[in-house]
């Protein structure tokens, strides 16, 4: 009778621990799946390297990968936004200052869009993400267009815009994968 009680207790404990295990382990993305997602961007190699360089992608599910991609895009956009704001304050050329102000506003809006995406990821509102991705992308493209008229680009804003556009394309790919599930 004692062994039945012990067996029952061990079984019960096992069931409890298995139900507590995070769902990430059962839906972990393989390297092949990450490469397949990255193949939908304009640079598979850079996308894959970038995602795999983040330690959070070691054992991640599709939602986690999308969250990592949003974090990477947000981090880069915030860094560039700060740089642009510093040039707004330093510039003595009124035309260039206005271009920097316009781009700063675009980056502010793009960062807001990325934060909204992050909230949608947390809440599971995946179908709402594509609109925010497009909005964020459009904001960066607008900065690129406005900055295209600048005669000098000492801060390499055009190149930095391309980096953020690429990161947003990764967000688009990783999040669009979620809305199919």
Mark where each language-model region is.
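Folded extracytoplasmic luminal domains of secretory or organellar precursors
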Residues: 24-181
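Terminal membrane/secretory targeting segments in land-plant proteins
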Residues: 1-29
